[in-house]
From Swiss-Prot:
Lineage: Eukaryota, Metazoa, Chordata, Craniata, Vertebrata
SUPFAM superfamilies membership: Snake toxin-like
Organism superkingdom: Eukaryota
Protein name: Toxin AdTx1
Variant or mutagenesis effect after changing residue 38 to I: In AncTx1; 2-4-fold increase in inhibition potency on ADRA1A and ADRA1D adrenergic receptors and 17-20-fold decrease in inhibition potency on ADRA1B and ADRA2C adrenergic receptors
Keyword terms, alphabetized: Disulfide bond, G-protein coupled receptor impairing toxin, Pharmaceutical, Secreted, Toxin
Amino acid sequence: LTCVTSKSIFGITTEDCPDGQNLCFKRRHYVVPKIYDSTRGCAATCPIPENYDSIHCCKTDKCNE
C-alpha cells in the first residue's frame, strides 16, 4: 500500500506502508475557522479524532491525497 505523506504546490510525497499498516489516513486539525493543518500517512487502525479533528481512512493507493 502506498500512502501520501505530504501535499504541496510542488506535488505529493508518498511512502510505502510497512507490514501491518494497511490503511492510509488524512487528519485535518482545525486551528482557527477556515485554517487547518493536515497530517497524512500509514496506519494499522484508523486514528480516533480528537478535539476538532476530522479523520478520513481508506485502503487504496494514494487514497488520502
